[in-house]
Amino acid sequence: MAVNSASYSRWCCFADSWQREKLASMESPEEPGASMDENYFVNYTFKDRSHSGRVAQGTMKLCLEEELFADVTISVEGREFQLHRLVLSAQSCFFRSMFTSNLKEAHNRVIVLQDVSESVFQLLVDYIYHGTVKLRAEELQEIYEVSDMYQLTSLFEECSRFLARTVQVGNCLQVMWLADRHSDPELYTAAKHCAKTHLAQLQNTEEFLHLPHHLLTDIISDGVPCSQNPTEAIEAWINFNKEEREAFAESLRTSLKEIGENVHIYLIGKESSRTHSLAVSLHCAEDDSISVSGQNSLCHQITAACKHGGDLYVVGGSIPRRMWKCNNATVDWEWCAPLPRDRLRHTLVSVPGKDAIYSLGGKTLQDTLSNAVIYYRVGDNVWTETTQLEVAVSGAAGANLNGIIYLLGGEENDLDFFTKPSRLIQCFDTETDKCHVKPYVLPFAGHMHAAVHKDLVFIVAEGDSLVCYNPLLDSFTRLCLPEAWSSAPSLWKIASRNGSIYVFRDRYKKGDANTYKLDPATSAVTVTRGIKVLLTNLQFVLA
């Protein structure tokens, strides 16, 4: 077919022009009208989001696990660590200053460290290279000191928080001393609070008797509860080294500030509209008034509770053997070591002289009465089994008087192995770990509650009056309460505080007083004011 030469020439010119425009547009993608789809493969930046993490992980693996490219050897207690100046300097200002200074360590191939143990330095290496470290209670204070010295700030702060959460009677003075040396105000405050609220337990310990003067002054000037006998503690500290410390006597007595305790009594119970338990803390004033100073929610099915050294301990929940402590310094709930076995309706009793909590009797999950006795060493966070009770009981009242636990009433087995209300008094001596049953019985039986005042045990039971039990004379004295209470039987609870006996009603009608205060010296009964607790089922009252 013949092609028109003029048409062919025009078509070639058009094609040539279109090709030149296309090439020009590809060379100049910034010009208006350029297509993003056409420029996608011409100008594209790829960013690997996992690159930095992969490089860091790979580098640490090469450096630590395969021990490649090590350029410094750190010797600690004879063990040599093959490490890297760059990694150490990146994480620690201490090592950065060491390696960039004119000191001999900047050029030596082997560096010996004298102020750290081998096991703790291994933990520091793990932290520096991997960012993780397993903190153990037995090494925590050394890790705290060394991390501050080597300027590992994040690790130091975490150790400080850990120590503040775990400070207790057994280590509070040591932790306070430690925090003072390292200028750590948060940890110092937590340790000081523990020390001043447990001063009576600490005053004869080696740590207290060797306490520096400025730390003792800071403790007693911060407000010590009257119940901790701060004057006796001051005298004990002075008499330990009277020749040198007599000069501080007047200044210490002037600095002393005694206060009432913020939390005198804990009520544990339930509201009618709730299924879980509540712990309500009460402040008892000298004008016969009681005010609510706090409230904490607890788990379901609290089976036992006690107050030890100002802290609240409760056992129970979905797993009956679990135990928690409400730290009075931080108002946080902390897990404690669980009981060896699940137990229900057992009795928890605080024994401050041994810094221990005893669990006595109770029921197994198979509803069998138990005569087991175990005790929890607060300082060691460990439960230990000891001598059993003479008679298996559950739901008994417990009171500690001079190291002897009086277990009162509850339920015991009858001759047919059915349970019956008990009138027994069992005495467990925490010094000898021996138990015996009194040859006489209580004037009433069943579930009751008890509190110690001086050398007496005050007992209340369902639908009965208040009874004063004198273990030395083996006698009981019945004390009558107002007729309005006696006419409406209910399960009462009792607490001893500030030289007075407080009696709480479990249920009360609208308008009735729910708390009475008894003066044991005069037998005078007064109605307390200012409290309206909505708990309809008082499980425990702890003072």
Curated annotation (Swiss-Prot):
SUPFAM superfamilies: Kelch motif, POZ domain. This is Kelch repeat and BTB domain-containing protein 4. It comes from Macaca fascicularis. InterPro entries: BACK (IPR011705), BTB-kelch_protein (IPR017096), BTB/POZ_dom (IPR000210), KBTBD4 (IPR042884), KBTBD4_BACK (IPR042950), KBTBD4_BTB_POZ (IPR042949), Kelch-typ_b-propeller (IPR015915), Kelch_2 (IPR011498). Keywords: Kelch repeat, Repeat. It holds the Pfam family BACK. Component of the BCR(KBTBD4) E3 ubiquitin ligase complex, at least composed of CUL3, KBTBD4 and RBX1. Substrate-specific adapter of a BCR (BTB-CUL3-RBX1) E3 ubiquitin ligase complex which targets CoREST corepressor complex components RCOR1, KDM1A/LSD1 and HDAC2 for proteasomal degradation. RCOR1 is likely to be the primary target while degradation of KDM1A and HDAC2 is likely due to their association with RCOR1. Also targets RCOR3, MIER2 and MIER3 for proteasomal degradation as well as associated proteins ZNF217 and RREB1. Degradation is dependent on the presence of an ELM2 domain in the target proteins. Residues 172-264 form the BACK domain. Residues 70-137 form the BTB domain. Kelch repeats lie at residues 264-310, 311-353, 356-403, 405-455, 457-505. It comes from the Eukaryota. The gene is KBTBD4. The keyword Repeat applies.
